[in-house]
Amino acid sequence: MRPALSDYQHLASGKVREIYRIDDEHLLFVASDRISAYDYILDSQIPDKGRILTAMSVFFFDHLLRTAGVPNHLAGPPDDERIPADVLGRALVVRRLDMLPVECVARGYLTGSGLIDYEKTGTVCGIALPPGLGEASKFDEPLFTPATKAEIGEHDENISFAKVIELVGAELANQLRDRTLQTYTAGADHALSKGIIIADTKFEFGVDRDGTVVLADEVFTPDSSRYWRADSYQPGVVQNSFDKQFVRNWLTGPESGWDRHGNTPPPALPDDIVAATRERYIEAYERISGLSFDDWIGA
């Protein structure tokens, strides 16, 4: 159920976020406690998840702007007076942008859909890779592996850089690739200094009225990124993670009884999986930011 914010017009619902109109120039992004997996929105919710995602995004928006000069869509602090009290801590005031129709994925390691593509074709998004790679292999340099933006219930599809050029033109395509890799490198370097590997991540960008490519939506959250423990990293095996992969693993494991390739939605998550997911998200935030989640605003 989305929050009823009488002062603002509701514009759109995503898998996790609700978007409201503040005025012609600004939007209110509200992160819910919903969790999605395999293109389904699960019946279960993760307590405080929306606040954790918001706290992580605020930390990284600030870090990336200060250290790498990456512009973002924030238009006010997390306690901005335009944010209603009942969504404080899970909502942000942001600038309206012309959003670009590309999921900008950066990969530092081979896993997930990238591994599936590689095992079938020896490539990821049309990028030829050397033979002999496996689960969690580290790339010499991070890859830009874009995808389409799918509607809720549909699959994002990996696409080639040539397809990105078709969608947005060569100039913007080059900017998206360069900004994606710059942003990933800056964030991954910071995370590694805190004992966390960001194996891959997904960004969204828009263009402001001046034509600047601007980082939007969320950034380096456990929903949009794979977080691995650096001290236990071992190529060739599935890694110990802080992110949504924990939920995916339970859903596809024997305990859930769910057939991912069938036509039925996933089951509700057991209480212990809900609690463990919340703990992993909080640990990721606290390790990355050096801050206590208890001090984050809202409730």
From Swiss-Prot:
Query: How is this protein annotated for GO cellular component?
Result: cytoplasm
Does the entry feature the keyword ATP-binding, yes or no? Answer: yes
| GO BP: any one term | 'de novo' IMP biosynthetic process
Recorded name of the encoding gene: purC
Xref: SUPFAM superfamilies:
SAICAR synthase-like
Among NCBIfam families, the record links this protein to: PRK13961.1, purC
Record bears the keyword ATP-binding: yes
What Pfam families does the entry give?
SAICAR_synt
Reaction catalysed by this enzyme: 5-amino-1-(5-phospho-D-ribosyl)imidazole-4-carboxylate + L-aspartate + ATP = (2S)-2-[5-amino-1-(5-phospho-beta-D-ribosyl)imidazole-4-carboxamido]succinate + ADP + phosphate + 2 H(+)
This protein's pathway: Purine metabolism; IMP biosynthesis via de novo pathway; 5-amino-1-(5-phospho-D-ribosyl)imidazole-4-carboxamide from 5-amino-1-(5-phospho-D-ribosyl)imidazole-4-carboxylate: step 1/2
Which organism's genome codes for this protein?
A: Mycolicibacterium smegmatis (strain ATCC 700084 / mc(2)155) (Mycobacterium smegmatis)
Entry's family note: Belongs to the SAICAR synthetase family.
Q: What is the official name of this protein in its record?
A: Phosphoribosylaminoimidazole-succinocarboxamide synthase
